[in-house]
Structure formats: C-alpha cells, structure tokens
Design a protein with these regions (language model features):
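Structural signature of tandem alpha-helical TPR/SEL1-like repeats
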Residues: 21-34, 56-68, 90-101, 128
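Structural marker of alpha-solenoid helical repeat scaffolds
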Residues: 3-4, 37-38, 71-72, 105
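Specific register positions within alpha-helical solenoid repeats of the TPR/Sel1-like families, i.e.
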Residues: 19-20, 54, 87, 121
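TPR alpha-solenoid repeat register
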Residues: 10, 45, 78-79, 112
Length: 129
C-alpha cells in the first residue's frame, strides 16, 4: 500500500483477508475503514466491513453493513455473509432465504458450500413446488 496509498481495493483486500482468517482484527478494521472512507458506496467494501464486524462479535453493525451492501448489489458472496450473521443471531429462516438466493445465482459458490458445511446446514427445499 506504500506504492499505492490511494488504492481502496488494496486496503480492502488486505483487511478482508485478515478478517477471513480471523487474525489481527483491529488492523483489519482499520484497513477496511480506510477503504470505506475512499469509496463509501462500494458494496464489496461494505461487505468487508460487515465481515470484520462479524468477526469482532459486533452482530448489529455486521448486519447493518451487510444489508446495505446487499441492497446495493445482491451478490452471492454478500448473501452468504449476511446469511451467516442472521444464522448467528438465530434467524435460520432468514439465513436460509439468503443462501437459497445465493445458490440460485451461483450454484457452485465455494463460500456458500463451505459456510453450509461449517454450520452443518443444508439448503432447504420448498416441498410445495
């Protein structure tokens, strides 16, 4: 980032990578916060901030950022993250709905597969159809 101090994507990528590994979360927060200052409307940076907040145990903030990100761009990866936050809050039906949406857009999504496996969940099917 020394070579490109104005590159919000570099800050975001490093911050997200740290959060994904659940390491150095205060540093991850600072990096993503810097990216968000540079590009406040970027849904992928909002997703990263939501994920950092989730890893830090701030479920209200995590849900807020992830809902905003998903409203801007209904990306499968954002849906997976928001679904995991809802699951952690006990909203299994809400999580399942988002995971179904993610699966509909990208059936081979690795983040969805690994999240479902880690949480011992499977996609619920609508038996009425």
């Amino acid at each position: 980032m020394i070579a490109a101090p104005d590159n919000q994507h570099a800050y975001n990528a490093l911050g997200y990578s740290l959060a994904e590994r659940n390491e150095r979360l205060p540093e991850a927060y600072a990096l993503v916060e810097q990216a968000l200052k540079m590009a406040p409307g970027d849904p992928f940076i909002m997703d990263s901030m939501g994920w950092v907040q989730f890893r830090m145990g701030n479920l209200d903030e995590a849900e807020n950022y992830l809902r905003r990100a998903y409203a801007v761009r209904s990306d499968p990866e954002i849906a997976v993250h928001l679904g995991e936050v809802l699951f952690a809050r006990g909203d299994v039906a809400g999580a399942q709905k988002l995971w179904q949406e993610a699966h509909g857009k990208d059936p081979k999504n690795d983040a969805l597969k690994s999240t479902l496996a880690r949480l011992n969940q499977s996609l619920k099917t609508d038996q009425a159809n």
